[in-house]
Every structure is written in C-alpha cells, then in structure tokens.
C-alpha cells in the first residue's frame, strides 16, 4: 500500500514537472530556418555549395540556387 502511494506521488510529480517545462519552452525556438536546413541536409541527398542546380529541382543543401550553382 505504501509503495503504491509512493509510485502515485512520483508519477504526479513527474507529470507536473513536464507540464511546467512545456509551458516555459513554448515559442522559444529562435533559429527555425537554420534548424530545418540542417535537418534537410541530414535527411535527403542534396548537393553541396558550388554544385550545379536548377530552380525547378530543389536539391541544394544550402537552400538557394543562384545562376545554376548551389550557394
């Protein structure tokens, strides 16, 4: 019985901590574009800086294609 009460209290405490930290971290991601570009380069096969590219086929890791070159 005591063990059950301790487990219930521990679960309630952990849940409260999760809810508090979730509220504090809302909207604090500052560099979303940088993070998404990093994920893009890690999850897909993309071309590095200076490689040839076309505007119709978005495949540059840097995210920009200028004058036929990834920039």
UniProtKB/Swiss-Prot annotation:
Intrachain disulfide bonds: 46-61, 53-65, 60-70
Prodomain positions: 23-45
Described function: Omega-conotoxins act at presynaptic membranes, they bind and block voltage-gated calcium channels (Cav).
Cellular compartments per GO CC: extracellular region; host cell presynaptic membrane
GO molecular function annotations of the record: calcium channel regulator activity; ion channel inhibitor activity; toxin activity
Alphabetical keyword list: Amidation, Calcium channel impairing toxin, Disulfide bond, Ion channel impairing toxin, Knottin, Neurotoxin, Presynaptic neurotoxin, Secreted, Signal, Toxin, Voltage-gated calcium channel impairing toxin
Notes on the domains: The presence of a 'disulfide through disulfide knot' structurally defines this protein as a knottin. The cysteine framework is VI/VII (C-C-CC-C-C).
Tissues in which the UniProt entry reports expression: Expressed by the venom duct.
Record-listed Cysteine amide modification sites: 70
Family assignment from sequence similarity: Belongs to the conotoxin O1 superfamily.
Organism taxonomic ancestry: Eukaryota, Metazoa, Spiralia, Lophotrochozoa, Mollusca
Compartments, record wording: Secreted
Species of the source: Conus achatinus
Classification via Pfam families: Conotoxin (PF02950)
Signal peptide annotation: 1-22
Protein's name in the database: Omega-conotoxin-like Ac6.4
